[in-house]
Amino acid sequence: MTLKDNPPPFLHFRRFEALMQVPLLAILTAFIVAGILPNALGQLGNAELSIAVVPKGTDRERWNAIHQGALRASEELEREGVSIKILWKGDTATSRDKQIQVVDTFTGQRLSGILVASFDEDKFAGRIRIDRGSDLPMVYIDSGLDADRPISYVATDNFEGGAVAADRVGQLIEGVGNVILLRHQQGDSNAEAREAGFIERIKSSYPSIRMLSIDQYSGDSFSNANRVSEYLLNRYGRLVNAIFASSLQGTDGMLGALRDFDLAGQVFLVGHDASDTSLEAVRNGEIQGLLVTNPYKMGYLAVTTLVDHIQGGNMPTIVDTGITLVTMANIESDEVKEALGASSESL
């Protein structure tokens, strides 16, 4: 008996393997031609995306608007075939440490991406660098970070917003007079940018405007803002022609103080961010300018930007959501209604 008549077992296996390769290749080719295999492989890329959204807080309408914008984006993406889940987590207390704990919890999970509105730029960015080896993409909403990983910053140009406020003040007092800047609080990078933009524009464009005070802070409560505002009016009430309050709390607190001093409508007030109180004051002429952003649009664009990046698109460094100056003349316009979230369908 020869080797040809009775081959060893391993030769039988090799012949069987060679025979099997032909039909398998034919099957795969048929699947590709029929479009079955690409569709099957595509399903692997259609797993549900999990995107965490971490706001500065959960007890203010601004953050709820960001949440609603994010949900709107997820609903539209679902209709386009992108399965997506929004995980919303914040704290009612305005605590930097608690926010970092929330982000730490999320970064330890299997997420597709994360959206963050940070409290403290320096402190938060330092914490993020510890985890910079992670490939978790992040988009920063409302405030930016000097972080190392690829990110996008979806927010308003706050420096430009401060310049817009300065121009409104300059227009109101015709380029001549005394003004007060009521700051928000130290560590708030958004407010600090607005304040810097205001000061720079006054100095560069309005040489006949004198800044009486630029070192007082309203803080994060109406009561403190009102107290500081009364101090400023006690000291400068007979001299001041116009005031810029760089925060929601400062605007409402200063408005209350102007009313108490019978100066509302006589001393011009330009504020930032909208409340029912401040909007009514615009209508009745007690506030002559109100800078408003569009948090709904921020949430919407943050999600769509992040998903585009996850799907292979280029993530822009900055997505500017714009700022609107609200006055008595335009408060009922569609532009203002959209910025205030009253006409979100126009997105």
PLM regions with names:
Residues 241-248, 255-322, 326-335:
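Exported/periplasmic ABC-transporter solute-binding proteins
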Residues 1-49, 130-134, 343-344:
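Short, low-complexity disordered leader/linker segments with a strong preference
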Residues 4, 17-24, 34-35, 189-190, ...:
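Hinge/cleft segment of the Venus flytrap/periplasmic-binding protein
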Residues 122-160, 178, 275-283, 287-288:
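Flexible loop/hinge segments that line or gate small-molecule binding clefts
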Residues 68-86, 203-208:
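Signal peptide-proximal N-terminal region
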Residues 55-67, 86-98, 120, 154-164, ...:
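Hinge/beta->alpha junction and helix N-cap segments in small-molecule ligand-binding domains
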Residues 114-132, 198, 218-280:
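Hydrophobic alpha-helical
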Residues 51, 70, 164-206, 212-216, ...:
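An alpha-beta-alpha
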